[in-house]
């Protein structure tokens, strides 16, 4: 009898080990059924949006109460049940809490702060489209988010209670893009594009894909972190139809990467969507090397490459959340060379007033002239690299090479 051939191993996608990944379900919503909890629309309907609701679950400080009262007239307050469960109820310094619970300091405008720190309104040729860079545009498809970050650079237009209304003229945008053949890259943002229904998002992507010179599409989203239930198999299958399509997610602290978020990111990655992360450097959230190192390592385990670390924009009322640029450089220097290169994000400042992203790096070039570059490596050691080739030398004479 012939021996049975060994069965080939079955290859399956594996989630990263459960170490460091936790679920906080159901938390404050113990009465929710599993079906309700996993329904992204249920999550949106049950967001915490008022001072009274927040006080039911958190021991609020006086400055938090004052900050919550301010949200009737500026950037709204709203947190999904999934994300609210991550907040430490008795710790006002909780890094999750600092990102979404407003403080009275939001009413204090310090020198240099602006309503539109990135100068987007001045680069908006048609309503809802920002054309600041030569070959790419920012398409603001909605003014709503799953939860509202207190450092939001578009707080003037996001959430419906800001200083301005977002007025996006979709047909005028499509006409502009048809005409401007230099545009090869469109980034969908807002607000958050993934809050749109599958059908609405498909309609936008279809119109963009019909424009021949647009090479690839991007979506910037915090939904996989605030509302991982939205990342359904149906959504992923639809997005897969529009490749090449990339996605930038927004994670600031390792605790945000729960088991549900890990699984949502895995579904996007399995759909062939390259994932990058954009963090904002925030005081009391991620402004130390250990926290940032834990975050970037955890992101890589979720198949997300750390892409940008932003200096917090000079948005009105953000002084209590901003760090010094020196702190950002210190963090990058603590990472560069000490961990995987793929894990180290590029530290950037969005130049105030509309200058665009400017990369900021520690001083690894000590000296540079026409003869040489003097370099400092991550250990502080000094090296020289010649700018011009020296005198030629021949290691092997051509006539000595045997012809076989």
Where are these regions (language model features)?
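Flexible, acidic/Gly-rich N-terminal and inter-domain linker regions that tether
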Residues: 2-131
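Conserved, mostly hydrophobic/aromatic
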Residues: 83, 149, 307
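Short, charged beta->alpha transition segments
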Residues: 124-127, 137-140, 170-177
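Canonical Radical SAM [4Fe-4S] cluster-binding loop centered on the CxxxCxxC motif
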Residues: 131-168, 219
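Mobile, glycine- and charge-enriched loop segments
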Residues: 151-152, 181, 262-287, 378-404
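Conserved AdoMet/S-adenosylmethionine-binding subsite of the radical SAM
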Residues: 171-185, 194-339
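C-terminal accessory regions of radical SAM enzymes
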Residues: 332-404
């Amino acid at each position: 009898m012939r021996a049975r051939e060994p069965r080939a191993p079955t290859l399956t996608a594996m989630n990263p080990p459960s170490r460091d990944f936790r679920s906080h379900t159901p938390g404050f919503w113990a009465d929710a059924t599993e079906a309700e909890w996993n329904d992204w629309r249920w999550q949106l309907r049950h967001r915490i949006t008022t001072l009274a609701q927040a006080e039911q679950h958190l021991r609020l400080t006086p400055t938090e109460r004052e900050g919550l009262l301010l949200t009737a007239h500026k950037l709204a307050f709203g947190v999904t049940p999934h994300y609210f469960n991550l907040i430490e109820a008795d710790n006002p310094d909780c890094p999750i809490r600092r990102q979404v619970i407003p403080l009275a300091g939001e009413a204090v405008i310090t020198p240099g702060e602006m309503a539109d720190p990135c100068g987007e309104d001045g680069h908006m040729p048609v309503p809802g489209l920002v054309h600041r860079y030569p070959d790419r545009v920012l398409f603001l498809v909605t003014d709503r988010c799953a939860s509202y970050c207190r450092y939001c650079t578009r707080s003037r237009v996001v959430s419906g209670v800001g200083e301005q209304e977002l007025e996006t003229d979709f047909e005028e945008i499509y006409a502009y893009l048809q005409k401007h053949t230099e545009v090869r890259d469109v980034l969908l943002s807002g607000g958050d594009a993934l809050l749109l229904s599958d059908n609405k998002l498909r309609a936008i992507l279809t119109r963009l894909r019909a424009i021949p010179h647009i090479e690839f599409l991007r979506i910037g989203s915090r939904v996989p972190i605030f509302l991982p239930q939205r990342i359904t198999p149906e959504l992923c299958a639809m997005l897969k139809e529009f490749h090449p399509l990339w996605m930038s997610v927004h994670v600031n602290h390792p605790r945000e990467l729960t088991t549900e978020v890990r699984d949502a990111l895995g579904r996007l990655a399995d759909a062939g969507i390259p994932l990058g992360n954009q963090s904002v450097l925030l005081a009391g959230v991620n402004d130390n090397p250990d926290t940032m190192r834990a975050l970037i390592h955890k992101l890589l385990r979720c198949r997300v490459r750390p892409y940008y670390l932003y200096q917090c924009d000079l948005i009105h009322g953000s002084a209590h959340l901003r760090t010094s640029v020196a702190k950002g450089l210190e963090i990058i220097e603590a990472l560069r060379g000490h961990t995987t290169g793929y894990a180290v994000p590029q530290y950037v400042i969005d130049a105030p007033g509309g200058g665009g992203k400017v990369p900021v790096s520690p001083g690894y070039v000590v000296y540079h002239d026409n003869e040489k570059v003097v370099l400092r490596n991550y250990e502080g050691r000094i090296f020289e690299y010649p700018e011009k080739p020296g005198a030629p030398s021949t290691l092997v004479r051509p006539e000595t090479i045997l012809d076989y």
